[in-house]
Amino acid sequence: MDRMASSMKQVPNPLPKVLSRRGVGAGLEAAERESFERTQTVSINKAINTQEVAVKEKHARTCILGTHHEKGAQTFWSVVNRLPLSSNAVLCWKFCHVFHKLLRDGHPNVLKDSLRYRNELSDMSRMWGHLSEGYGQLCSIYLKLLRTKMEYHTKNPRFPGNLQMSDRQLDEAGESDVNNFFQLTVEMFDYLECELNLFQTVFNSLDMSRSVSVTAAGQCRLAPLIQVILDCSHLYDYTVKLLFKLHSCLPADTLQGHRDRFMEQFTKLKDLFYRSSNLQYFKRLIQIPQLPENPPNFLRASALSEHISPVVVIPAEASSPDSEPVLEKDDLMDMDASQQNLFDNKFDDIFGSSFSSDPFNFNSQNGVNKDEKDHLIERLYREISGLKAQLENMKTESQRVVLQLKGHVSELEADLAEQQHLRQQAADDCEFLRAELDELRRQREDTEKAQRSLSEIERKAQANEQRYSKLKEKYSELVQNHADLLRKNAEVTKQVSMARQAQVDLEREKKELEDSLERISDQGQRKTQEQLEVLESLKQELATSQRELQVLQGSLETSAQSEANWAAEFAELEKERDSLVSGAAHREEELSALRKELQDTQLKLASTEESMCQLAKDQRKMLLVGSRKAAEQVIQDALNQLEEPPLISCAGSADHLLSTVTSISSCIEQLEKSWSQYLACPEDISGLLHSITLLAHLTSDAIAHGATTCLRAPPEPADSLTEACKQYGRETLAYLASLEEEGSLENADSTAMRNCLSKIKAIGEELLPRGLDIKQEELGDLVDKEMAATSAAIETATARIEEMLSKSRAGDTGVKLEVNERILGCCTSLMQAIQVLIVASKDLQREIVESGRGTASPKEFYAKNSRWTEGLISASKAVGWGATVMVDAADLVVQGRGKFEELMVCSHEIAASTAQLVAASKVKADKDSPNLAQLQQASRGVNQATAGVVASTISGKSQIEETDNMDFSSMTLTQIKRQEMDSQVRVLELENELQKERQKLGELRKKHYELAGVAEGWEEGTEASPPTLQEVVTEKE
């Protein structure tokens, strides 16, 4: 502490000369270095002073530029070490502000040069912490923040001083190690905690009931918070991103402490940002972001996409108020005219309006008109007369002002007498205060005795502080070896708990000692400071009154002197009249010279305009030639790549090729229009260049799409398409070559290009998949037809089931009748459920069309969404077909000629088809739609009905098989052995057939997916759709 005080003592010279390490070099370099050090010394002393006002930005900026100039902070620290930072709190506060700016925006070596002063900053922080009022606590907390910032950037050198990093740099800082990210998050929490403590302490020290942000003292305390706001915005953003990354790698319970600490800091930061944004001081300097209403939910990974990084905006500086408005030419002309009228009026006032008929006007008597000089003389006489009148008015006005000032002086003399009376009272109070001051001095001597008795306590406190430093170093060691501590959790937990307990004991002892010292020192200083402040305020008021009296006396002397000045000005005006007469002739000579110079300038301007027009024409021609050559190069490269191997792995589609051909046709029309406009107006070349460039790129795309489409086409169409693409490329090159000369439109004929495009379009339409043969305008009608046909098929199937049930009741009895009734009843329930599903699907489709078509018709909506429409058509067909097949299978089962397995398979197929219909309907539906909920409920009803059909079929099959059990009672051993062998042979045959049938089923499904993909508009080259509900149920069985 003593070392810090001695190194920062004040020297008599307010601008100390910095001792720099100069080498023996050229005298010029030494002079430059000395000038730099002098400039830095002046700026640092102006930025860091004892006045309670905010640091001026220009002085801080000069300090920042100085660090970049010398690539370090040696000059800054050499000047700061001479300032009494430990004896003046305002000086220390402004030092912290400037040093914070240097750490953020200065040269990176500022941190390295400042590390040697870490201990001095810590000692100064502890010293200022003993003061509970004024800037003491503020300086203590700010110094702790700067110490934390230096330690953080020392441990994490990847973070710059201003904390501006990209997401990739943030990931690199953690080296892709979860332990590093864990430790980095803890350090960011500590860093942000120090920032928030300073923020909160500054606000608590201000009286928020008044407009403190517009006072100089309030701005002095609020100015450093701009740097704090910038740091807090970045730290909050990085903390959120790191916590999301940790939650993706570690369990949520492990990070519970991180989340609790983040919630606490989030609440504080949000409140401080809101309070800061309402202060008038910050509104004109910085735009403070507002945090979201609720904190991020780290347990939901998708919440990271909702996070918006807070951005602090510092507006550009306003224009200088010193700039003067520039008068326009018309305003100057009006001013000259008004002055001319003023001169005329003043001349008439002096010589009279009949001056032209004066007997001394010889020109008028002789019949000769007055020349310009006579007019000028007349105007000057009028001006002199006006000035005399103005002078008389000013004399009158000055006399009135003098009388007012005399009255004001009388009032001030009365105020002065009152002030003298108050001064006498203040002198009496001062005597009383001196008596009390003597008493305080005696008390102070007693206090010094008490302080000497506390020296032993301070030595003990220093010993305890040394123990605390050792424990803190041990704790830092433990944090750095975090990974080892995780493996030895039990032993380390015990050690950390012991260290924390010891630290708590030391902190308690240190706090008790600090409180006792603070109470003893404050009691003596508080009364002395209050009395001195009252005496100083009285002296300042007296000095202010004396200064006002001197100003008033000076204004009286100025008024008397102004009268003498007016007389001198009148004499000067008479002299100026004579000079104007001689100057008029000189101006006529200058005017003739200027006219001649104007003619020469006009000739030069005409020749320059002609040369510039020619130059612009040449540049436009060069630009057109360059654009055409670039377009030809793009097309030629596309033609050269037709045979290159990389295209083998790029399979294209015919619809992409046709889309590109359509775009080329439109581009050719636009190019012809642009060419016509260019021939009519050569200055407008932008549209022509754009059209040429667009045609080149579209042609390249068409050739590439044609080459990739050939890879999937049959050999003969592929060869034709390749040849057509080549011919189109050559025709395009020829067309572009015809644009080189500025001829008529006949030189650039696009007929050959259009023919090649027509040929490519015809081949592409032949290569389109069969599923796209339906005209888009017919899709809407086809959807309605297929849905109606499906409903009709369901109603027909229901009627047939009722008919079969009636026949079975009439012709069957016993177990067979029971089985048939159960199966047919479940089939009837299934058909009813399907009918409800179709009605719900129609309602949902109608809602989708009404909400999505806008002003278009339903047919136009279906045509616009053709692939979705084709999916609906396919699903409707599948439902109707499945219902018909199931009824046929049920009829055969009832008659005894069918298999129960066919009925189960048909049920599964109907369930899969209805699921496809539901999925196709849900694609464009609103998730909150009531019709969608009804459709999903109907789908669940279909699934339940399908399960009922399968269950009844299995039950009926088991009942019938129980009646057909074999009777082995009458068979011999040989017969049983024979039938056993036959059964084994049959089992082997059935297993072989089952294997072959499964392979056949796989091939059928593969082919079905391919055909379904083409029919429903699936993208070529994609995988097959997921298996249907029927396939899933079959595999489970």
Curated annotation (Swiss-Prot):
Q: Name one GO molecular function term.
A: epidermal growth factor receptor binding
Record region (Disordered)? 1017-1037
Q: Which PROSITE patterns match?
A: ENTH, I_LWEQ
Start and end residues of each stretch annotated as Important for actin binding: 867-924
* Residues spanning the membrane: none
Q: Which residues form the signal peptide?
A: none
Instruction: List where this protein forms a coiled coil.
Output: 368-644
User: InterPro entries per the record?
Assistant: ANTH_dom (IPR011417), ENTH (IPR013809), ENTH_VHS (IPR008942), HIP1_clath-bd (IPR032422), I/LWEQ_dom_sf (IPR035964), ILWEQ_dom (IPR002558), Sla2_fam (IPR030224)
Please report the stretch or stretches of sequence annotated as the ENTH domain. Answer: 32-160
Q: Which Pfam families match?
A: ANTH, HIP1_clath_bdg, I_LWEQ
Please state every residue range assigned to the domain named I/LWEQ: 771-1012
Q: In which tissues is it expressed?
A: Ubiquitously expressed with the highest level in brain. Expression is up-regulated in prostate and colon cancer.
Specify where the region named pDED lies, as residue ranges. 410-491
Q: Which residues carry this modification: Phosphoserine?
A: S338
Domain text from the record?
A: The pseudo DED region (pDED) mediates the interaction with IFT57. Binds F-actin via the talin-like I/LWEQ domain.
User: Any remaining note in the record?
Assistant: The affinity of the huntingtin protein-HIP1 interaction is inversely correlated to the length of the polyglutamine tract added to the huntingtin protein in Huntington disease.
This protein's assembly is summarised as: Homodimer. Binds actin. Binds HTT (via N-terminus). This interaction is restricted to the brain. Binds to IFT57. In normal conditions, it poorly interacts with IFT57, HIP1 being strongly associated with HTT. However, in mutant HTT proteins with a long poly-Gln region, interaction between HTT and HIP1 is inhibited, promoting the interaction between HIP1 and IFT57. Interacts with CLTB (via N-terminus). Interacts (via coiled coil domain) with AR. Interacts with AP2A1, AP2A2, CLTC and HIP1R. Interacts with GRIA1, GRIN2A and GRIN2B.
Name of the protein in its database record: Huntingtin-interacting protein 1
What organism, scientifically named, is this protein from? Homo sapiens
